[in-house]
Amino acid sequence: FLPFLASLLSKVL
């Protein structure tokens, strides 16, 4: 899982 994707998920969730 890519770090930038994790950041986006954190913002969405």
Swiss-Prot record:
GO cellular component: extracellular region
Location within or outside the cell: Secreted
Positions of post-translational Leucine amide modification: 13
GO biological process: one example: defense response to bacterium
Annotated S-S bridges: none
Family statement: Belongs to the frog skin active peptide (FSAP) family. Temporin subfamily.
Protein role: Antibacterial activity against Gram-positive bacterium S.aureus (MIC=80 uM).
Name of the protein in question: Temporin-1Cd
Organism of provenance: Lithobates clamitans (Green frog)
Source species taxonomy: Eukaryota, Metazoa, Chordata, Craniata, Vertebrata
